[in-house]
From Swiss-Prot:
Annotated positions binding ATP: 156-163
One Pfam family in the UniProt entry: LRR_RPS2
Regions crossing the membrane: none
Molecular function, one GO term: ATP binding
Similarity-based family: Belongs to the disease resistance NB-LRR family.
Record domain NB-ARC: where: 114-418
Coiled coil: 25-73
Organism: Arabidopsis thaliana
Protein function: Probable disease resistance protein.
Lineage: Eukaryota, Viridiplantae, Streptophyta, Embryophyta, Tracheophyta
Keyword Phosphoprotein: no
A single BP term in Gene Ontology: defense response to other organism
LRR repeat positions: 400-421, 422-444, 447-469
Protein name as it appears in the record: Probable disease resistance protein At4g14610
Amino acid sequence: MALTKLRFVNQFSQWLCVRKGYIHSLPENLAALQKAIEVLKTKHDDVKRRVDKEEFLGRRHRLSQVQVEIERLCFCGFCSKSFGKSYHYGKMVSVMLKEVENLSSRGVFDVVTEENLVAQVEEMPIQSTVVGQETMLERVWNTLMKDGFKIMGLYGMGGVGKTTLLTQINKKFSETDGGFDIVMWVVVSKTSEIYRIQEDIAKRLGLTGEEWDKKNENKRAVDIHNVLRRHKFVLLLDDIWEKVNLELVGVPYPSRENGSIVAFTTRSRDVCGRMGVDDPMQVSCLEPEDAWDLFQNKVGENTLKSHPDIPELAKQVAEKCRGLPLALNVIGETMACKSTVQEWRHAIDEEWKKTEVKMHDVVREMALWISSDLGKHKDQCIVRAGVGLHAVPEVKNWRAVRRMSLMKNELEKILGCPTCPQLTTLLLQKNHKLVNISGEFFRFMPNLVVLDLSWNSSLTGLPKKISEVETTNTSEFGVHEEFGEYAGVSKLLSLKTLRLQKSKKALDVNSAKELQLLEHIEVLTIDIFSKVEEESFKILTFPSMCNIRRIGIWKCGMKEIKVEMRTSSCFSSLSKVVIGQCDGLKELTWLLFAPNLTYLDARFAEQLEDIISEEKAASVTDENASIIIPFQKLECLSLSDLPKLKSIYWSPLSFPRLSELAVQEHCPKLKKLPLNSKSGTAGVELVVKYGENKWLEGVEWEDKATELRFLATCKSLYR
């Protein structure tokens, strides 16, 4: 019995000590609990900023319950004088302290963070330096960091460096702690589909999985919005072509309250306005010095020093890039391995400035690879242009060749008699040393469709046997200087393209009459002169050519060009005209009969006074001259070195499609332009471009409204 009582006393003492310990340790435990909960809250706050999945909300709710209990204990526990209540609170504090310590020690939040954490900024490949854009980058960044600035639009032409600039901004966010939780990059492009934009944003936020994939655009927008509204974010949208509705995507609109930022690039200033940007930033082409620095970096010092003439030629090539970074990069990289003067001159050489597209070697090689059925039929297409050939290259299988280009080489003689039953295209132009072509060379080319022998200044004659080629399919035939006789060109009845320009021995009037027999001619470039001085031979009469699409007239000694059929449809297909070095011509009124003309370039014509003469217009047409309104489809008008030019047209024209009216140089008497305040208002922005400030200052505008309309948008051709 005594033993039983002793055991009871011991157990009661232990029980009492435990309870006394709860009460005695209550202040200490409560302080420890408060400290532990602060640590736990710090972890909670850190994770809260980075975790986007809704499952995390349950843990936050549990933590908030713990916090409420602590506050209640702090308020009630110490105030109670009841042993029972003090014991009860003391025990609760001790238990909760262990729970909090257990939560922290188990690393619950670390696991969550590891599973849901996304990088603040997604790093992207980028150039180490941005030649010529440092100032622009600093300006954009400072504006973005300015308090209250929340949405930015960068606009500029394609290839000017907008994407590069935005990539640099993305990089600066990774290097600078601006307090942003996440930076998102989305490439939008022409197909600005809401669904695809949402997908790219969701990947950055960690919103993935089967459940997400099943949601429609509206539900996705809600999920994205619920995540982003709790965060300070940056959204970078690259290459947008139309307004992106942020609300439909689910992106909260940036404001001073949420501190978020949206920045985008576009080619259109109008898009900036539709996105709510009142003062967008224009990304312009590089200044000449910066452009030259970039081009030099791409070409490399070794190439520039490989020949004393190359630096000057390189500057000419760089100038043709007009400060466009994409062109400077691509062409600079292409020319980096060009160490001969010939290769650099080849890069500079141009024929039709407005109708040719430069193609660098990589793109050309890829195009040839594709055209040869991914390399399977590479023997069918032989391109050796501008590589310094002195003789026709050896070909293993002439029978397989369908297209061959040997243009711009050093060929002196073309000999042999290859059998080419499948050859359709042969380009031999611009071989300035070429003096002789064997008559047998063309003998076994029965399917030749395109033959270009133009710009061969040393070639003394056309092979006599070329007319013996058994073909009725020839559709393009070009010849050039000092071929002696052009008679017989009209026998090529299927001829579609004839190039005779820039000849030392130009086409005479009698030979020009044969042109009217070319019923299918579409492209014609010719030099014409008269052998006699009589005025009757100073007039060139064009036949009606309904199919012709392009005409280039060079070194024309005629004083006047007429047409046989004086109706508005006799040149109904003509779209492009170039007039150059035609010192006798005083007007080009015959263009009234080209209703579909889109491009007109007139240059180096010392006597040219009018493009369309009012006096001539009244006499040259069988129709009422007032009914024929010229240049309704004209898109580009370029004038240069026309010292006597006074008028383009005698009254203002609507120019519904004209986008560029360029007066380049040496047109001092052209004071009045055929423009009024309503010209070019049909949807296309009409811009007047000029080469000389003095000319622009002397323009006599139709009225004040016209001056205000066009003067503000005039652009220099050399800036």
